[in-house]
């Protein structure tokens, strides 16, 4: 009988990252786990619709036996079966993040018996989760370098809090994992600003772009008007293309927050990234831990290790025979497999 891994959901950042990482790793390794205190560090602890959808999606893909899979549950037992490729569709039923559900199940499908397609409906532009364009334009090119081939398509936007968006990813089994070396980002090649609008006046986007232009030299400035029924919503993004990596930063607009303030938040985040010589931003660092661990080698630099990153590393080390090293030097933290 395989050993049971016991996890404390209050560990580290105390949110859903522990659960998502554990589900991915359990499916890959075949190791069962229990987790208590799910999202103990949040104002509303326990499983929300997004987390419950991730659990049910993982269970369907690997025919797992699950206990505690219900809204509000703070305890879960997950016994995985065999991962099967196929065509899967999952509905969150709220504006919960589609990409976080995909993030949970796609790594397991790298080990499936054939190609797969996973479609998730819910929220696509959520202030607490990476949008589909981040996955598509930033993460997936790096995964391709590692021998991981998946392609994400944003079918329909769904802004928080209404939801209604659809994201799909096609993924193939991985033949061989390659190592990723991202010690330096290199010189900046170009920067691109983009604003999405749905049911929001165009002058909002124009003011957001003006704020970005006031701080950066942009090679491109794009405003995309989406159908009104995909909103109301607004997202402003800035993409930084460097010699070795492309990073993308975003802020989701909020009611009663001016366009200038929304864009200024983005400017602050991008300036913080550019102020450090680190190659990888905070969100991307979280996403690279698992594929790097599966490759068994590699490294990247980040300005500061976030609580999400440290939590993710701790969970990975419980399931896989790897150890990460974090070394601070020259204004960055170098994260590597020891």
Swiss-Prot record:
SUPFAM superfamilies listed in its UniProt record: EPT/RTPC-like, RNA 3'-terminal phosphate cyclase, RPTC, insert domain
Catalytic activity: a 3'-end 3'-phospho-ribonucleotide-RNA + ATP = a 3'-end 2',3'-cyclophospho-ribonucleotide-RNA + AMP + diphosphate
Molecular function GO terms recorded: ATP binding; RNA-3'-phosphate cyclase activity
Compartments where located: Cytoplasm
Keywords attached to this entry: ATP-binding, Cytoplasm, Ligase, Nucleotide-binding
Pfam families: RTC (PF01137), RTC_insert (PF05189)
NCBIfam families listed in its UniProt record: PRK04204.1-2 (NF003246), PRK04204.1-3 (NF003247), RNA_3prim_cycl (TIGR03399)
Family of this protein: Belongs to the RNA 3'-terminal cyclase family. Type 1 subfamily.
Protein name: RNA 3'-terminal phosphate cyclase
């Amino acid at each position: 009988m395989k050993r049971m891994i016991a996890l404390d959901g209050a560990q580290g950042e105390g949110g859903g990252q522990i659960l998502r990482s554990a589900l991915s790793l359990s499916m890959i390794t075949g190791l069962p786990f229990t987790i208590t205190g799910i999202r103990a560090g949040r104002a509303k602890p326990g499983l929300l619709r997004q987390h419950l959808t991730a659990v049910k999606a993982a269970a369907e893909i690997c025919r797992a036996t699950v206990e505690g899979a219900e809204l509000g549950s703070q305890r879960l037992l997950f016994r995985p079966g065999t991962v099967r490729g196929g065509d899967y569709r999952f509905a969150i039923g709220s504006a919960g993040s589609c990409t976080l559900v995909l993030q949970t199940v796609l790594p397991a499908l790298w080990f499936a018996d054939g190609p797969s397609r996973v479609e998730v409906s819910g929220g696509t532009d959520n202030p607490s989760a990476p949008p589909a364009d981040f996955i598509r334009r930033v993460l997936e090119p790096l995964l391709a370098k590692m021998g991981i081939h998946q392609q994400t398509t944003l079918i329909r936007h769904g802004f928080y809090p209404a939801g209604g968006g659809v994201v799909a990813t096609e993924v193939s089994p991985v033949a061989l994992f390659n190592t990723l070396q991202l010690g330096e980002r290199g010189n900046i090649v170009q920067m691109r600003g983009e604003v999405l609008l749905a049911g929001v006046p165009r002058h909002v986007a124009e003011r957001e772009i003006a704020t970005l232009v006031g701080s950066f030299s942009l090679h491109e400035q794009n405003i995309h008007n989406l159908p009104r029924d995909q909103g109301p919503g607004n997202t402003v993004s800035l993409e930084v293309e460097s010699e070795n990596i492309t990073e993308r930063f975003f802020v989701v607009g909020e009611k009663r927050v001016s366009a200038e303030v929304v864009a200024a938040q983005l400017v602050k985040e991008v300036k913080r990234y550019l102020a450090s010589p680190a190659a990888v931003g905070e969100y991307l660092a979280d996403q690279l831990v698992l594929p790097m661990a599966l490759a068994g080698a590699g490294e990247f630099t980040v300005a500061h290790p976030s609580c999400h990153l440290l939590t993710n590393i701790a969970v990975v080390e419980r399931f896989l025979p790897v150890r990460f090293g974090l070394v601070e030097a020259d204004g960055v933290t170098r994260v590597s497999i020891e």
